[in-house]
């Protein structure tokens, strides 16, 4: 990683920002680096709103609520008191997945973070900067190539399979080793086999020291040989570590056959058979997701969860919409195998499968046999990639080691043969390699068989001399299947490559873990033995692991676990002494014993120096590092600050004064009290690049002097994160869901995490920073607490509470800084610089090999005809079905029904133009005044009654679809609604598909009567979700998911109650349908198309599949518009003067004093020193008659226009200020300019909030000179806002909303047809236009209980359970089955 500025300066800068952080009224999302000019400070009119409506009309703010307010004002005032979907991620005790429930069996080597593993001084220090976790480090370059591990002095050269490691560097030879090595730091280095790593490193060091002359001679000989070797021979020598170039005899394109099919090349040289496959790294995307049943650790009951396989982690959730709150995870970096469970009944389909890791076996059950097989295949691929996390796979074995070759006919598509290779001099293990050839398989078989017959392997070469005793440190092997990955060899051998744990690549050396093959005896062992069995016996390594028990439990460890108090607080580390009688002992059960005296001494010294790694978050001082200075007054005050700390402080005083007392007191037990009190006291911490606590944060918790590296390791272990994830800051806070939950916030480079610390809770939060839109500071829910709101893409807000405003502000600033540092970094597309270097080096190696192959094509026959693939193909997988073309074979007559203003009709024109291009026959049914506009685009038209001007008057006076709006419409304008329904029915005849704006109210009933598929489309959120409030019920402050969801329920209920009487009469009279209810209609099951950008309103996680956010349906008309000359001159003059240009236009709004609003706009423009293009549309039609109506003259800085296409105009300006309508907002955001929104009614408040949450603009609550001028200046000068708006504009312009909507229509058409048939069967009568075939008696029976006739099977969270129980009691139990719901 690139170096940051000095940590001290960074910390001071952070403190300064912390002190200056806001308790201001504006959102902290707009932290602006530059101060506002003095002229933009608040003036006397700072609290005045010149857009206030006429007196008596009501206003959003206090006495004058805006017109759109309704019953939701009461909801907003009361707030959210309940959470409909409480998602405490608790599970039964039998699940046992919490960190604190790791079993401690005496004979079992647990790999929890409470164990420490000693490292030899000869090993490279495994610091967190170098322990890469998921991706091991590679060094493939011209000056640091792969080298083979030298054999023991007495072994036969050339009779062993190549083992590749990196030569130890100067750092690796350092006598200092890292005192900490948590599992998460180097997950690929199997902790249980770390001793083997030491043995091989010690051997390599010793041999390098003993044989310098021979090494030099070999290099000289190799140089002379290279002069006459081919480029391919030289390249293979470098890649596979041969001692000298070997002539390439033959080359074939083939595939290595195991549980996966890996395509690559086989190279047959004079002395070796090599296999190479290029395996590019895949991006972190979700590989597979879906529902599975999981069995608990102790409870045999299966519970249903939503599973997601992403990267190396299999996570599961109680609710698929809560993807940031996992119930648990399986870290596949430690996976051993994934396989179907064997059934006693062979005829029965297997739905169960299991995943074995180094700690336990997980049992799962899929819904079908096919699903189980697909999951197993996906898991096998991930385990393979996790264990071979490189960019290439290499295998090399000497021809002399080949025992035999035989054909293995597996499939008719390819010829397959098996090569059996003896392992080495030290063991009689036999490796088996399967190679499949799609071409030239017979030639390859005959050629290799000829080589074997010419030089059969001598038996004497396999047997060591009788007097020779091979050191166990010389070789550590598994049963078979060696995998060499770039610079670090990764081995995976056993009964299939997934049946045993393989070697995992660390930053140096290698580890190997064969369960039954380390030092294989001649007697073949049962290959079905599981790797887990090797943990059952108390081997030396397991004894060391068991002895390294952590005694530095932290506060979070204490509160999170109760078994901490059940173990001794003081443990003696058992010392291992070298023993001569162990020198020749064979290694078994997957444990390597180091017998080298130096290694034993190093291990012993390392043990004396080390702590044990714990699963905690805060540590204590080492007993040997007691502060001996006299206690200061501050220390005494701190000791008495908290009740629990008084005893701890007194004990520390005695411990530092008396050696005898120090021996008598259980120091660690007192540490428990200190840490619990410290944890409840809260606080915060910042960490540097090495994850050490920054100096300015040491005072937060003085008794914690631990090395900060441990914090990062525990953080990564808690959340199964890679070692590249660096911890930056931690905070103690409350997470508010249903109840406040105390825990710890972790902020790293790419994640914001939370872990509960309350006993009995297991809530975890893993939130990628790229999904955070904004952070806002609010007052806490409880008195004396400070609130912080995290706004997430497509998810409800998260609320945190802090004890102090200082900690809250610091957390907000830290999150903002993290967001800025990676705002435009896409996780799946951009990698770290180190990862880029590794990928480039692997690609360079692959490219050079290809070039060498081409250069040497004349020296040998090349049969490489199979295209290379980076995919890991499953064996015998069903061929992937081709993409189904959902487009109907015949042209459809499609009617689009909408009412409202021009902005409501324009998106449908764009959609219909796309449908015309697809060969369909679209028609728009709307108000008659839009007919010329619609027909000029070649679209058919049908009139719908209702004056849009009258409709706008109702909206302006009462608010859009508020209770007063519906009340007036149903009383004074009852005839208007009747005419609307009747005219809509007539306009929709002769249609095959109906697409309607739900504001038209009639479409769902018309489609039911005509039995045609029905879609909805709208410009604002209308479907129930917890992520956003209803567009007509946006609160002043964030209210949370419960409030958001209830706004939709309340709106649907109120909206339907207001029109239900008229609609049902219309249904019976004209449509011939029975009366209906909201439950029978089930509008939330209707396919929905939202015509706004997913970049602006991200799809909520709880949206079902039939709701799609397609992107804006723009109608570009600017190409045919010629701008006036004076407008072009105005723009040119502004650019020449170096002035910013803004557009101001609030549409046809109604204000009490239009002159005052005009004067405010003029003064704000002059005060902000910008140029303005003004579209003045406000009027005083409903204004105060006493208000002045004198026209305000416009200065030269303002140019007034009547109309201009948004797509042309917004491309000429630097910022736009408007009312926040859906279409206007989309146009300004597409242009990539900062947007200022002053909402008035309807959905304008929603889009104004979205603009501010995205950081691309400002939403003004009031409009006056002070506020507006400052907003204009910030929108034109804030580089942060300008860049964000530019990036968002690029995203929107890259979308094709119309095309996406058409494809969504095709895909959901069959689903919509199914809904239409179900509805018509339930509600049709003999008088229906399309009557059903039911008899009169059947119709009468349906009249009683038709509400459950077609209840959906699945997660029906929208329908209340009590209602279903009530309806079920009324229904005839003998006729109707009970409604089925999901188990989840």
Curated annotation (Swiss-Prot):
Entry-linked SUPFAM superfamilies: PH domain-like, UDP-Glycosyltransferase/glycogen phosphorylase
EC numbers: 2.4.1.-, 2.4.1.173
Species whose genome carries this gene: Aspergillus oryzae (strain ATCC 42149 / RIB 40) (Yellow koji mold)
Localization (cell): Cytoplasm; Preautophagosomal structure membrane
Region spans: Disordered: 1-64, 86-189, 204-229, 457-526, 560-629, 1322-1350
Stated role: Sterol glycosyltransferase responsible for the glycosylation of ergosterol to form ergosterol-glucoside. Involved in cytoplasm to vacuole transport (Cvt), pexophagy or nonselective autophagy.
Domain of life: Eukaryota
UniProt free text on domains: The GRAM and PH domains are required for the localization of ATG26 to the preautophagosomal structure (PAS) and are involved in autophagy.
Protein's name in the database: Sterol 3-beta-glucosyltransferase
Compositionally skewed regions (Low complexity) per UniProt: 21-36, 146-156, 174-189
Matches recorded under InterPro entries: ATG26_PH_GRAM1, ATG26_PH_GRAM2, EryCIII-like_C, Glycosyltransferase_28, GlycoTrans_28_N, GRAM, PH-like_dom_sf, PH_domain
The reaction(s) this protein catalyses: a sterol + UDP-alpha-D-glucose = a sterol 3-beta-D-glucoside + UDP + H(+); ergosterol + UDP-alpha-D-glucose = ergosteryl 3-beta-D-glucoside + UDP + H(+)
PH domain location: 285-384
Name of the gene: atg26
């Amino acid at each position: 990683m690139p170096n940051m500025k000095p940590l001290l300066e960074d910390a001071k800068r952070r403190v300064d920002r912390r002190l200056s952080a806001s308790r201001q009224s504006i959102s902290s999302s707009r932290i602006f680096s530059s101060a506002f000019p003095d002229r933009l400070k608040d003036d006397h009119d700072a609290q005045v709103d010149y857009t206030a409506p006429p007196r008596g009309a009501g206003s959003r703010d206090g006495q004058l609520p805006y017109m759109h307010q309704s019953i939701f004002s009461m909801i907003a005032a009361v707030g959210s008191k309940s959470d409909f979907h409480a998602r405490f991620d608790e599970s039964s005790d039998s699940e046992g997945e919490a960190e604190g429930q790791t079993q401690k069996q005496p004979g079992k080597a647990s790999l929890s973070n409470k164990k420490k593993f000693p490292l030899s001084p000869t090993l490279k220090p495994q610091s967190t900067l170098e322990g890469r976790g998921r991706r091991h480090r590679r060094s493939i370059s011209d000056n640091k190539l792969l080298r083979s591990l030298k054999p023991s002095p007495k072994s036969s050269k050339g009779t062993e399979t190549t083992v590749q490691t990196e030569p130890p560097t100067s750092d690796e030879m350092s006598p200092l080793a890292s005192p900490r090595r948590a599992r998460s730091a180097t997950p690929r280095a199997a902790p249980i086999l770390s001793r083997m790593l030491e043995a091989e490193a010690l051997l390599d060091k010793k041999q390098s020291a003993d044989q310098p002359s021979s090494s030099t001679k070999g290099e000289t000989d190799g140089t002379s040989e290279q002069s006459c070797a081919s480029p391919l021979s030289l390249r293979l020598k470098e890649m596979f570590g041969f001692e000298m170039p070997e002539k390439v005899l033959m080359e074939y394109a083939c595939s290595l056959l195991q549980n996966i099919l890996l395509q690559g090349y086989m190279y047959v040289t004079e002395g070796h058979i090599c296999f190479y496959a290029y395996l590019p790294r895949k991006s972190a995307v979700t590989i597979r997701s879906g529902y599975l049943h999981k069995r608990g650790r102790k409870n045999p009951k299966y519970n249903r969860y939503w599973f997601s396989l992403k990267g190396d982690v299999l996570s599961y959730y109680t609710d698929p919409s809560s993807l940031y709150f996992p119930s648990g995870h399986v870290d596949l970096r430690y996976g051993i195998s994934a396989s179907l469970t064997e059934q006693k009944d062979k005829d029965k389909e297997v739905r169960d499968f299991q995943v074995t890791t180094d700690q336990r076996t997980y049992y799962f059950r899929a819904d079908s046999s096919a699903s189980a097989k697909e999951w197993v295949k996906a898991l096998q691929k991930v385990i393979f990639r996790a264990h071979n996390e490189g960019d290439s796979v290499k295998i090399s074995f000497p021809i002399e080691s080949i025992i035999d070759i035989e054909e293995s006919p597996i499939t008719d598509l390819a010829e397959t043969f098996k090569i059996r290779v003896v392992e080495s001099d030290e063991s009689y293990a036999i490796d088996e390699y399967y190679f499949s050839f799609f071409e030239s398989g017979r030639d390859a078989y005959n050629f290799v068989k000829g080589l074997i017959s010419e030089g059969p392997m001598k038996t004497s070469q396999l047997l060591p001399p009788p007097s020779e005793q091979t050191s166990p440190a010389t070789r550590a092997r598994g049963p078979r299947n060696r995998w060499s990955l770039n610079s670090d060899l990764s081995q995976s051998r056993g009964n299939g490559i997934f049946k045993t744990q393989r070697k995992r690549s660390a930053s140096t050396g290698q580890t190997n873990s064969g369960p039954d093959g380390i030092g294989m005896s001649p007697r073949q062992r049962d290959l079905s033995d599981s790797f887990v069995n090797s943990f059952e016996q108390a081997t030396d390594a397991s004894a060391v692991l068991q002895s390294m028990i952590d005694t530095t439990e932290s506060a979070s460890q204490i509160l999170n676990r109760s078994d901490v108090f059940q173990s001794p607080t003081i443990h003696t580390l058992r010392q291992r002494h070298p023993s001569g009688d162990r020198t020749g002992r064979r290694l078994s059960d997957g444990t390597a014993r180091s017998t080298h005296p130096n290694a034993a001494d190093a291990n012993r010294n390392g043990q004396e120096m080390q702590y044990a790694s714990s699963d905690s978050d805060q540590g204590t001082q080492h007993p040997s590092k007691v502060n001996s200075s006299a206690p200061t007054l501050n220390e005494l005050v701190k000791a008495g600050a908290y009740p629990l700390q008084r005893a701890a402080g007194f004990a520390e005083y005695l411990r530092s004064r008396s050696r005898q007392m120090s021996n008598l007191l259980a120091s660690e037990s007192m540490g428990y009290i200190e840490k619990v009190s410290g944890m409840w006291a809260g606080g915060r911490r910042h960490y540097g690049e090495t994850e050490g606590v920054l100096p300015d944060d040491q005072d937060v918790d003085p008794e914690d002097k631990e090395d900060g590296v441990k914090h990062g390791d525990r953080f990564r272990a808690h959340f199964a994160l890679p070692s590249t994830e660096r911890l930056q800051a931690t905070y103690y806070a409350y997470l508010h869901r249903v109840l406040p939950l105390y825990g710890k916030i972790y902020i790293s480079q790419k994640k914001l995490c939370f872990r509960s610390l309350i006993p009995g809770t297991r809530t975890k939060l893993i939130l990628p920073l790229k999904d955070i839109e904004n952070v806002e500071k609010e007052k806490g829910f409880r008195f004396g607490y400070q609130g912080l709101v995290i706004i997430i893409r497509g998810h409800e807000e998260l609320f945190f509470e802090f004890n102090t405003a200082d900690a809250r502000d610091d957390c907000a600033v830290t999150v903002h800084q993290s967001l800025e540092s990676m705002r435009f970094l896409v996780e799946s597309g951009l990698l770290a610089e180190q990862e880029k270097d590794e990928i480039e080096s692997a690609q360079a190696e692959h490219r050079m090999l290809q070039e060498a192959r081409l250069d040497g094509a004349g020296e040998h026959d090349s049969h490489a005809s199979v295209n290379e693939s980076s995919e890991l193909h499953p064996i015998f997988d069903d061929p992937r079905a081709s993409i189904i073309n959902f487009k109907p074979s015949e042209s459809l007559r499609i009617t689009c029904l909408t009412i409202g203003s021009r902005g409501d009709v324009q998106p449908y024109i764009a959609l219909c133009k796309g449908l015309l291009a697809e060969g369909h026959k679209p028609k728009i049914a709307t108000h008659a005044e839009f007919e010329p506009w619609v027909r000029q685009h070649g679209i058919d038209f049908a009139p719908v009654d209702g004056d849009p001007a009258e409709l706008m008057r109702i909206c302006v006076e009462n608010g859009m679809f508020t209770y007063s709006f519906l009340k007036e419409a149903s009383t004074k304008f009852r005839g208007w609604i009747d005419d609307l329904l009747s005219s809509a029915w007539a306009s929709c005849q002769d249609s095959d598909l109906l697409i309607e704006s739900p504001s038209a109210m009639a479409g769902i009933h018309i489609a039911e009567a005509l039995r045609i598929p029905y879609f909805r489309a709208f410009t604002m959120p209308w479907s129930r979700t917890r992520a956003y409030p209803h567009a007509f019920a946006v609160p002043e402050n964030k209210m949370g998911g419960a409030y958001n969801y209830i706004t939709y329920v309340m709106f649907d209920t109120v909206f339907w109650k207001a029109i239900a009487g008229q609609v049902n009469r219309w249904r019976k009279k004209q449509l011939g349908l029975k009366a209906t209810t909201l439950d029978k209609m089930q509008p939330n099951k209707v396919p929905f198309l939202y015509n706004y950008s997913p970049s602006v309103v991200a799809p909520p996680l709880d949206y079902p599949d039939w709701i799609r956010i397609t992107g804006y349906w723009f109608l570009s008309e600017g190409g045919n518009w010629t701008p006036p000359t004076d407008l072009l001159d105005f723009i040119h003059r502004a650019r020449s003067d170096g002035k910013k240009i803004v557009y101001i236009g609030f549409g046809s709004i109604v204000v009490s004093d239009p002159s005052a609003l005009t004067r405010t706009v003029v003064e704000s423009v002059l005060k902000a020193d910008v140029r303005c293009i003004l579209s003045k549309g406000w009027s005083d039609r409903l204004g105060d008659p006493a208000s002045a109506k004198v026209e305000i003259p416009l200065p030269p800085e303002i140019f007034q226009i009547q109309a201009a296409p948004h797509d042309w105009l917004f491309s000429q300006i630097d910022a736009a200020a408007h009312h926040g309508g859906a279409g206007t907002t989309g146009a300004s955001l597409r242009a990539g300019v900062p947007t200022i929104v002053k909402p008035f009614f309807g959905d304008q408040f929603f889009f104004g909030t979205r603009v501010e949450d995205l950081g691309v603009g400002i939403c003004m609550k009031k409009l006056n000179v002070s506020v507006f001028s400052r907003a204009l200046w910030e929108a034109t000068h804030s580089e942060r806002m300008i860049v964000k708006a530019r990036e968002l504009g690029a995203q929107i312009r890259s979308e094709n909303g119309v095309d996406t909507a058409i494809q969504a229509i095709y895909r959901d058409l069959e689903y919509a047809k199914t809904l239409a048939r179900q509805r018509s069967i339930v509600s049709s009568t003999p008088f229906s236009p399309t009557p059903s075939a039911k008899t009169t008696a059947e119709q009468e029976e349906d009249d009683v209980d038709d509400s459950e006739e077609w209840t959906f099977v699945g997660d029906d969270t929208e329908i209340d359970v009590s209602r279903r129980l009530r309806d079920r009691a009324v229904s005839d139990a003998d006729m109707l089955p009970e409604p089925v719901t999901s188990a989840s």
